[in-house]
Protein backbone atom coordinates (compact mmCIF):
# COMPACT_ATOMS: atom_id res chain seq x y z
CA UNK A 1 0.00 0.00 0.00
CA UNK A 2 2.78 2.45 0.91
CA UNK A 3 4.68 1.91 -2.33
CA UNK A 4 1.49 2.21 -4.41
CA UNK A 5 0.52 5.46 -2.68
CA UNK A 6 4.05 6.83 -3.04
CA UNK A 7 4.15 6.06 -6.74
CA UNK A 8 0.69 7.54 -7.27
CA UNK A 9 1.53 10.74 -5.36
CA UNK A 10 5.13 10.97 -6.58
CA UNK A 11 6.54 11.14 -3.06
CA UNK A 12 9.03 9.17 -0.98
CA UNK A 13 7.78 6.02 0.72
CA UNK A 14 8.79 7.29 4.16
CA UNK A 15 6.58 10.35 3.68
CA UNK A 16 3.64 8.16 2.64
CA UNK A 17 4.19 5.86 5.60
CA UNK A 18 4.22 8.80 8.04
CA UNK A 19 1.01 10.21 6.55
CA UNK A 20 -0.74 6.83 6.77
CA UNK A 21 0.36 6.35 10.37
CA UNK A 22 -0.79 9.86 11.27
CA UNK A 23 -4.19 9.11 9.76
CA UNK A 24 -4.44 5.81 11.62
CA UNK A 25 -3.57 7.26 15.01
CA UNK A 26 -6.25 9.95 14.60
CA UNK A 27 -8.92 7.23 14.53
CA UNK A 28 -11.20 7.18 17.52
CA UNK A 29 -13.36 4.37 18.82
CA UNK A 30 -17.03 5.23 18.54
CA UNK A 31 -18.28 5.12 22.15
CA UNK A 32 -21.58 3.29 21.48
CA UNK A 33 -19.70 0.67 19.45
CA UNK A 34 -17.07 0.17 22.13
CA UNK A 35 -19.76 -0.15 24.80
CA UNK A 36 -21.74 -2.65 22.71
CA UNK A 37 -18.63 -4.78 22.11
CA UNK A 38 -17.96 -4.80 25.85
CA UNK A 39 -21.55 -5.74 26.69
CA UNK A 40 -21.72 -8.51 24.07
CA UNK A 41 -18.51 -10.01 25.43
CA UNK A 42 -19.84 -9.81 28.99
CA UNK A 43 -23.00 -11.61 27.83
CA UNK A 44 -20.87 -14.49 26.55
CA UNK A 45 -20.82 -13.81 22.83
CA UNK A 46 -17.76 -14.83 20.82
CA UNK A 47 -16.56 -11.86 18.78
CA UNK A 48 -14.37 -11.95 15.68
CA UNK A 49 -12.85 -9.40 13.34
CA UNK A 50 -13.23 -9.93 9.59
CA UNK A 51 -11.68 -6.93 7.92
CA UNK A 52 -10.05 -5.46 4.84
CA UNK A 53 -7.74 -3.35 7.01
CA UNK A 54 -4.27 -2.44 5.88
CA UNK A 55 -1.31 -3.99 7.66
CA UNK A 56 -0.48 -0.67 9.36
CA UNK A 57 -4.02 -0.17 10.61
CA UNK A 58 -4.44 -3.70 11.99
CA UNK A 59 -1.11 -3.38 13.81
CA UNK A 60 -2.38 -0.17 15.40
CA UNK A 61 -5.79 -1.66 16.25
CA UNK A 62 -4.26 -4.74 17.89
CA UNK A 63 -2.72 -2.39 20.46
CA UNK A 64 -6.03 -0.75 21.40
CA UNK A 65 -7.87 -1.81 24.59
CA UNK A 66 -11.09 -2.66 22.71
CA UNK A 67 -9.26 -5.34 20.72
CA UNK A 68 -8.93 -7.55 23.80
CA UNK A 69 -12.64 -8.40 23.49
CA UNK A 70 -12.16 -10.24 20.20
CA UNK A 71 -11.68 -14.00 20.12
CA UNK A 72 -10.05 -14.12 16.70
CA UNK A 73 -9.51 -12.37 13.42
CA UNK A 74 -9.27 -12.79 9.69
CA UNK A 75 -7.54 -9.84 8.03
CA UNK A 76 -7.50 -9.56 4.25
CA UNK A 77 -3.90 -8.33 3.93
CA UNK A 78 -2.77 -11.48 5.76
CA UNK A 79 -5.02 -13.88 3.84
CA UNK A 80 -4.67 -12.65 0.26
CA UNK A 81 -8.44 -12.35 -0.24
CA UNK A 82 -10.77 -9.46 0.51
CA UNK A 83 -14.40 -8.88 1.34
CA UNK A 84 -16.75 -9.37 -0.41
CA UNK A 85 -15.03 -12.47 -1.83
CA UNK A 86 -16.83 -15.51 -0.31
CA UNK A 87 -13.48 -17.20 0.43
CA UNK A 88 -12.65 -14.77 3.24
CA UNK A 89 -15.92 -15.58 5.02
CA UNK A 90 -15.16 -19.28 4.58
CA UNK A 91 -11.73 -18.78 6.18
CA UNK A 92 -13.37 -17.22 9.25
CA UNK A 93 -15.99 -19.97 9.57
CA UNK A 94 -13.47 -22.80 9.12
CA UNK A 95 -10.68 -21.32 11.26
CA UNK A 96 -12.92 -20.82 14.29
CA UNK A 97 -15.38 -23.68 13.74
CA UNK A 98 -18.37 -21.38 13.47
CA UNK A 99 -21.90 -22.55 12.69
CA UNK A 100 -23.16 -20.10 10.05
CA UNK A 101 -26.72 -20.48 11.33
CA UNK A 102 -25.57 -19.10 14.70
CA UNK A 103 -23.32 -16.38 13.29
CA UNK A 104 -24.10 -12.72 12.65
CA UNK A 105 -21.99 -10.57 10.34
CA UNK A 106 -22.01 -6.81 10.96
CA UNK A 107 -20.55 -4.50 8.34
CA UNK A 108 -21.02 -0.97 7.03
CA UNK A 109 -20.82 -2.01 3.37
CA UNK A 110 -23.96 -3.52 1.92
CA UNK A 111 -22.04 -5.62 -0.63
CA UNK A 112 -20.17 -7.36 2.21
CA UNK A 113 -23.39 -7.99 4.13
CA UNK A 114 -25.07 -9.49 1.05
CA UNK A 115 -22.30 -12.07 0.57
CA UNK A 116 -22.52 -13.09 4.23
CA UNK A 117 -26.26 -13.61 3.81
CA UNK A 118 -25.70 -15.69 0.65
CA UNK A 119 -23.57 -18.17 2.60
CA UNK A 120 -26.10 -18.47 5.43
CA UNK A 121 -24.79 -15.94 7.94
CA UNK A 122 -27.30 -13.54 9.52
CA UNK A 123 -26.50 -10.10 8.08
CA UNK A 124 -26.60 -6.70 9.75
CA UNK A 125 -25.89 -3.53 7.79
CA UNK A 126 -24.27 -1.07 10.20
CA UNK A 127 -24.99 2.59 9.42
CA UNK A 128 -21.78 4.53 10.06
CA UNK A 129 -23.65 7.81 9.73
CA UNK A 130 -25.88 6.84 12.65
CA UNK A 131 -23.72 4.50 14.72
CA UNK A 132 -25.78 5.14 17.84
CA UNK A 133 -29.01 3.84 16.24
CA UNK A 134 -27.23 0.83 14.74
CA UNK A 135 -25.75 -0.03 18.13
CA UNK A 136 -29.12 0.35 19.85
CA UNK A 137 -30.79 -1.94 17.32
CA UNK A 138 -28.05 -4.55 17.76
CA UNK A 139 -28.34 -4.21 21.52
CA UNK A 140 -32.10 -4.91 21.33
CA UNK A 141 -31.60 -7.86 18.97
CA UNK A 142 -28.77 -9.53 20.86
CA UNK A 143 -29.12 -8.48 24.47
CA UNK A 144 -32.88 -7.96 24.77
Regions found by a protein language model. Give the residues of each.
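General structural signal for secondary-structure boundaries
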Residues: 1, 11-12, 39, 63, ...
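Generic detector of well-ordered alpha-helical segments enriched in charged/polar residues
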Residues: 2-3, 17-21, 58, 135, ...
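Short, acidic loop-to-helix structural element flanking the phosphoryl-transfer center
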Residues: 3, 8-48, 86
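Short, catalytically relevant binding-site loops at active-site mouths
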Residues: 26, 55-56
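Amphipathic coiled-coil/heptad-repeat helices and related helical stalk/stem segments
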Residues: 29-33, 59, 109
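Conserved phosphate-coupling serine/threonine residues in phosphotransfer and NTP-handling enzymes
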Residues: 51
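Asp-based, Mg2+/Mn2+-dependent phosphohydrolase catalytic module
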Residues: 54-55, 61-144
Amino acid sequence: MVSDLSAYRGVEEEYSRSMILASITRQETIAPTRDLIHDLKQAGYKLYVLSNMSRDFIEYLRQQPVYEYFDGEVISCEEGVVKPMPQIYDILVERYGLDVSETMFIDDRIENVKVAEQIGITPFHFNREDAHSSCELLREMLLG
